[in-house]
Amino acid sequence: MTTTTADHNISAQQKAVEENLVNRVLQSFDACENPRLKQLMESLVVHLHDFIRDVRLTEDEWNYAIDFLTAVGHITDDKRQEFVLLSDTLGASMQTIAVNNEAYENSTEATVFGPFFLDDAPEVELGGDIAGGAQGQAAWIEGTVTDTEGNPVPNARIEVWECDEDGLYDVQYADERMAGRAYMHTDANGDYRFWGLTPVPYPIPHDGPVGNMLKAVGRSPVRCAHLHFMVTAPELRTLVTHIFVEGDPQLEIGDSVFGVKDSLIKKFEEQAPGTPTPDGRDLGDQTWARTRFDIVLAPGA
């Protein structure tokens, strides 16, 4: 298999040595009986070797890269997934989402999953409060889940999770409390509604190797304010997405994981103290916000 690299005035003999090595590695996969695995490994080798040859990678740089990935592994545990952060900050997560979620008519766009999802969040009734003691400005979020033909999707499962006003998720606290997350099901009309918190921008964990990488290249570790959604329903494509906050200054600076899409930016309308709430909840002298996020699910594969 022929590969391509930039011309670095390398001698023909040296090019032949490098090309021969690539071909030998590729031939090592000839006995692989899994066609997809063989394709993945061959493409990975070609692109990896092309990168090494293109930048003329030094041995010190390669050893540094190995140490970096080792550090990523060491800091990863059941509460912190540094490899997800690395994938996100390099845009690899969003690129994978892009190739696997081809735009379908008017379906809601997908974005990154993130490292803070838990699969054992509590269930709340429609209109319930997902905050669970997390602090922040109360926000009423509502919408309707439909398919691409406009039909309501009853009993769709909606998982939501978000940070508190300090930009921290529940899993980042030592007390192992569960807050700022829950799941619910749409009603017969496909409607959902709940109390949450107005999202705020926050930095991804940047006290580890990924944070060091961002600092070295002059990038901000801050994510734009957002609220996570995962929506599932039979025979429809599972949707992982966010809603972002219109007017968030971080939108102009940029999202550290490249997750923002214009269609997902929603206005959180701030309500004055004493403004009646949709469900009659008494918030006293507090301001609160409300937004609407209608969700359109694409057909399943």
Curated annotation (Swiss-Prot):
Involved in resorcinol degradation. Catalyzes the conversion of hydroxyquinol to malelylacetate. Also shows weak activity with catechol, 3-methylcatechol and 4-methylcatechol, but cannot use 4-chlorocatechol, 4-nitrocatechol or protocatechuate. It is an enzyme of class 1 (oxidoreductase). The keyword Oxidoreductase applies. GO terms for biological process: catechol-containing compound metabolic process. It comes from Corynebacterium glutamicum (strain ATCC 13032 / DSM 20300 / JCM 1318 / BCRC 11384 / CCUG 27702 / LMG 3730 / NBRC 12168 / NCIMB 10025 / NRRL B-2784 / 534). One of its GO terms (molecular function) is catechol 1,2-dioxygenase activity. Belongs to the intradiol ring-cleavage dioxygenase family. Its EC number is 1.13.11.37. Its cofactor is Fe(3+). This is Hydroxyquinol 1,2-dioxygenase. PANTHER family: DIOXYGENASE, PUTATIVE (AFU_ORTHOLOGUE AFUA_2G02910)-RELATED, INTRADIOL RING-CLEAVAGE DIOXYGENASES DOMAIN-CONTAINING PROTEIN-RELATED. It catalyses: benzene-1,2,4-triol + O2 = maleylacetate + 2 H(+). It holds the Pfam family Dioxygenase_C. Keywords: Dioxygenase, Iron, Metal-binding, Oxidoreductase. InterPro entries: Catechol_dOase_N, Intradiol_dOase_C, Intradiol_dOase_core, Intradiol_RC_Dioxygenase. Pathway: Aromatic compound metabolism. SUPFAM superfamilies: Aromatic compound dioxygenase. Fe cation binds at residues 169, 202, 226, 228. Binds 1 Fe(3+) ion per subunit. The keyword Iron applies.
